[in-house]
Swiss-Prot record:
This is UDP-N-acetylglucosamine--N-acetylmuramyl-(pentapeptide) pyrophosphoryl-undecaprenol N-acetylglucosamine transferase. GO terms for molecular function: UDP-N-acetyl-D-glucosamine:N-acetylmuramoyl-L-alanyl-D-glutamyl-meso-2,6-diaminopimelyl-D-alanyl-D-alanine-diphosphoundecaprenol 4-beta-N-acetylglucosaminlytransferase activity; undecaprenyldiphospho-muramoylpentapeptide beta-N-acetylglucosaminyltransferase activity. CDD domains: GT28_MurG. GO terms for cellular component: plasma membrane. UDP-N-acetyl-alpha-D-glucosamine binds at residues 11-13, 164, 194, 289. The gene is murG. PANTHER family: UDP-N-ACETYLGLUCOSAMINE--N-ACETYLMURAMYL-(PENTAPEPTIDE) PYROPHOSPHORYL-UNDECAPRENOL N-ACETYLGLUCOSAMINE TRANSFERASE, UDP-N-ACETYLGLUCOSAMINE--N-ACETYLMURAMYL-(PENTAPEPTIDE) PYROPHOSPHORYL-UNDECAPRENOL N-ACETYLGLUCOSAMINE TRANSFERASE 1.
Amino acid sequence: MKRIVLTGGGTAGHVTPNIALIAGLKEQGYEIHYIGSYEGIERELIEKLGIPYHGISSGKLRRYLDIKNFSDPFKVLKGYREAKKLLKNLDPNVVFSKGGFVAVPVVLAAKKRKIPAIIHESDMTPGLANRLCIPSAAKVCANFPETLNYLPKEKAVLTGTPIRKELFSGNKIKGLDFCGFTANIPVLLIVGGSTGALKVNEAVRNLLPTLLKRFQVIHLCGKGKVDPSFNKHKGYVQYEYIGAELNHLFAAADIVISRAGANAICELLALRKPNILIPLSAAASRGDQILNAESFEHQGYSYVIKEEVLSNETLLQAVNHVFDNQKSYIEAMKNSNQNDAVDKIIGLIEEVRLK
């Protein structure tokens, strides 16, 4: 039987693309195992799917001064030894890594055991963990065309990011019914992430009376960010977080306002939803969201507002522009080479396995 080890963790963004591959890998006859950290978020997400999970020690490799810099390298070395032992016992045909520091010892151990490893980079520029893994990888999957410039030409493949199948099964009527909306008024969906986006929430609420003249508004504002004083507005609903019904809300939405995390924007691309991206500022991140957003804007998929210039005026201008030009955004997304990532990556896994 064909066997594959998936790895990646530390954040949900390093796990959900792996989850998106699982159904396709099973269809191809793969026995799937997952290697992650002992207590990371990946353990909970993977075990509930019934996939065999194997924990290893994990340490973060920091580029700044921290007392843990003295202990974490030993955790990485321990994780490497544990990964080598696991790979010897599991004897997979291929390792697929979504990144995160737990993946580093797994990819290095795969190289040592002569098992081909494929790694995936979601952001425009490779993060530290993936940079450490690239020399040991057989292939490197990229999410953005620009990322190919940072990768060895003989290893780089533009695939996009795997998207969960259930997102494609949304029903517009179910989404409208869930929100108590009518079918004859367009819908604006705001996705602030699980923790919310304070500046985005403020801008939307400041502009709400104007937005409601043209749209019905679904506002996913993040944990603890619901403001009951806005419930009086007809055509406006707010939620901390939406789980199983998210696919229906996407189906109901005509346009979307979102942060610019790689997984989030690739979902918008796959669903062909015209969108406005408001990336995290460089001060609040390593700048990857800004680069992600600029790439999507350059390719004609998105309208971008830098957080520093976000205001009532810039947001209203963006919303009206994107809504009035929906067709051009959708057409650009249809022509993208970053779609069908699941099929492309599984094809690459098969190619590497057969070499």
